[in-house]
Each structure stands twice: as C-alpha cells, then as structure tokens.
Amino acid sequence: NYSLGYPMTHGGWERDYVMRLVRKADFISWPKNIHSAPIVKGSTIKTTKAMEHHKDEGLSQMVRKTNRYSDIEATQFYDGKMAPVTSLTLIRKWWIESFRRGFLKRGLQDGKIGLIQSLYQGYSVFISYAKLYEKQRATK
C-alpha cells in the first residue's frame, strides 16, 4: 500500500490481502458494507506477488473519502442499534485507533507519513462516531 506517494510498511497497511481479481463468470455479488469482499463461486487463492495499491494521492482526497465512507458507516452503526455516543466515546475511539495504528502496529516507524496516517485513522473513526451521534440526536 502506498499513501501520499510513500510505501507503507507498518501500521496495518503493509500486508493488505484484498480480493482484487475475479473472473466475471464466478462473481455472485458484492455486499454493500465498507471494506467488504466480493462473494464468488468456488475457491480463492492468494498470489505470492504483491500488487501496488496507491490508496491516497493527497490529504484532500483522504478527507473526501472519509466524508463519504463515514456517512455509510454511521448509517450502518445506527441501523445496528449501537449504544448512544457520549463525549467519552468520541475521545476514546479517536485515541484508541490512533494508538493502535501508531504504536501497536508500529505505524510511527514509517516516519512522518506514518504519523499522519496514524492520527488520520483516529480522526476517520472519530468522524464516523460523530456522525452516529448526529443521527442519534436527530431521532430524540
């Protein structure tokens, strides 16, 4: 995975096994969940060769994607009857995701880009929960 033009070797982005190539005849459907995999007939295999994935060209693109995906995720959370969002929930979700990416998955070893990505992933999770809060508040 590349982000902002740099290869990501830590933080959970380094070995991203995603089904990328599917024979049309074996394709059944694709669930609407974020980061879901296609449903196919038969078995699947993992290749031994890596495929370059340039996930973000710039921060503006990242923010646009976050805004789009967080709308979907907040709706899924809301439809799943998630517990009410509190101030502590918002702080905790941001902090835990940033800590997980930066320290537990060693994203900070990727330098400044690892720091940016680790903090940004926390922000992305925060936005999803903030939008869930917005939905919960609107139905009171």
Where are these regions (language model features)?
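Catalytic-site signature of metal-activated, phosphate-bearing donor transferases
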Residues: 1-139
